Amino acid sequence: MVSEFDLIRKYFDRPARNAVLGVGDDAALLRPGAGMELAVSTDLLLEDRHFRAGADARMLGHKSLAVNLSDMAAMGAAPRWATLALALPAANERWLAGFSKGFFALARRFGVELVGGDTVRGPTGGPLVICVTILGEVPKKKALRRDGARPTDSIWVSGKLGAAAYGLARRDDMGAARRLHMPEPRVALGLRLRGIATAAIDVSDGFAQDLGHILERSGVGAVVHYDMLPKHRIEDRKLERRCVLSGGDDYELIFTAPAGSGARVRALARALKLRLTRVGSIGRRRDLRMLDANGRQMKVERGFDHFSR
């Protein structure tokens, strides 16, 4: 019978060249670079809440790290190390092989080393639980934060919105389904936004709700033009609005930047070959006004909240 430590050695023990000590001891030892601050974020994925039972293991390995990388992107931090904790209903080696393949393929792309974690057998028939903590570095006082937006700043968003939520609602759209299961973290964008953006956040719970976090922390409001939002193509207009504004799981970046920085942002878009769209502006009135093509205010649904009913 395979043991917990056999599983760790076989599927998750990799050389950690940028850590003093990695997997295999009671704790990892890390050495941040001189003049750097540590950015730390944790995300938990729960079966039947964040992914369906039977989800492809390789894609799940990718997504479990990608959502954490997206937090690093939103902070303008360079990802460095991660820990992984799993609560497994059973020791399924085929599943573990696929999961670790997806996890480490993405980790290699972004230079992330797995330096620790834990595995536990959960209740028989119970849900699979995946918890990743990621650590990154950012130069002192250079991190992108949620509390820096100022009146007259422009509001920008990367990529397109709504694909992941549409992929969950309609399984026949393969492109949308891929966006749901294998999101692309905007790490390069986050790093390049240092010195340009005044505030940033990733779109995990829905555009409206996540922009709302910036507004709340910054003590400001916003006017957003719905028709300017970059959207995944969805024929049903009602479903489109729900997916775009409150669907979540897009893992694009919303950021604010001074009104005069448009040329720099557009140059950055060209350099990264990434769509960056100006969608509104920050104001002093502390609310979010979403306007339709005729300038009428739209009702905006809240995004995802684990404890709302």
Regions found by a protein language model. Name each.
Residues 1-309:
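Helix-biased detector of long, well-ordered alpha-helical tracts
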